[in-house]
Amino acid sequence: TLPVVRDGSLEGVITIGDIAKTYMDVYDSMILSKARTQYRNIARAVDGEVITGNEHSYLLNGKVVIAASSRILMSDFISRDDLVIMGDRKDAQQCAVDMEASCMVVCQNASISEEIIKQAEKKQIVIIRTPRDTFTAAQHINQSIPVKYFMTKTNLVTFKMKDYVDDVKISRLLTETGNY
């Protein structure tokens, strides 16, 4: 268990189990938006660089999708505000722009045309380019979720420096929580 501190004040605690959830909860394609994940954190998690867009803004809506289908199929599953992981296919990049995705993660340092970049800028779409392949980017993207999303913030059991060890032991035995 590790304390999460801001300006000298305890905000919460995080456990190995909490961290493991970021790897286990892979079936929730909305998790990045639920966690209000910042685009610069996404770029860091995939070892990427922000090509255009506000890296300080957040993914607030939308799901994470991989553009691996035909444009017709992609038009059916990509929605406005989604984060789309893709490769070098120009039609996939254009589809993400046309569907007004909030973010495009372009893998394997694939080229992005100036026209796509201009359209993305106009629609305030963040474009991140990464050297990682699509599989690796998709695996690592959950590592961008802020600690505050997984940490325990309530029902914390705390002690002060002047508390006696015997009292701490008794308290630990009487409570079943790991929120210390």
Regions found by a protein language model. Name each.
Residues 66-154:
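Feature captures the catalytic cores and cofactor-binding loops of soluble hydro-lyases/lyases
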Residues 72-73, 77-78, 92-94, 159-178:
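Active-site/ligand-binding-proximal alpha/beta "capping" segment
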Residues 1-20, 81-82, 100-103, 166-180:
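Helix-loop-beta junctions that constitute the ligand-sensing/allosteric loops
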Residues 20, 90, 110, 163-165:
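Residues that cap or initiate secondary-structure elements
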Residues 6, 36, 40, 44, ...:
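Arginine residue identity/basic-tract feature
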Residues 16-68, 140-158, 170:
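Tandem CBS (Bateman) regulatory domains
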